[in-house]
C-alpha cells in the first residue's frame, strides 16, 4: 500500500507541501468523525481515504493534475465523506443552479472552499436566503464565489 505522502505526490502535491496538507486534512478528518458521533481513536485516515475523495472528484470532471491544486488550496477536502458530504453537495448545486457537474467543477476550481459547504445545512440556508431576498440564481452563485 502506498503511503500518504507518496499518494499526495502522485496527485501533484509537492513533498514540501504534503506535510501541511496532511496536517490540515487529518485535523478536519477527526472533526468530521466526531461530528458523525464516532470515536476518532477508532478511525484511520490515510491514502485509501484520500483516494476515495480524489476518485470522486475526477469522476465529476476534475482533471487529475488539477486535483493537487484543489488539495493544496483546500486540504480539508481530503477528509470529507464522499457519500455524506461531497455527493450531496454536487447534487444540490447541480439541481439548484441548473449547472452540470463540469460547471460546478469550474466554480470549485475558482473557489475551492465551496467544497466546505454542506448541502443540507449552510449551502441550502445561504442560497434560500439569497433567492428569497430577490437574488437570481446567477447572482447567488456569484455571491458564493466571491464570499467563500
Regions found by a protein language model. Give the residues of each.
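Long amphipathic alpha-helical repeat/alpha-solenoid cores
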Residues: 1-148
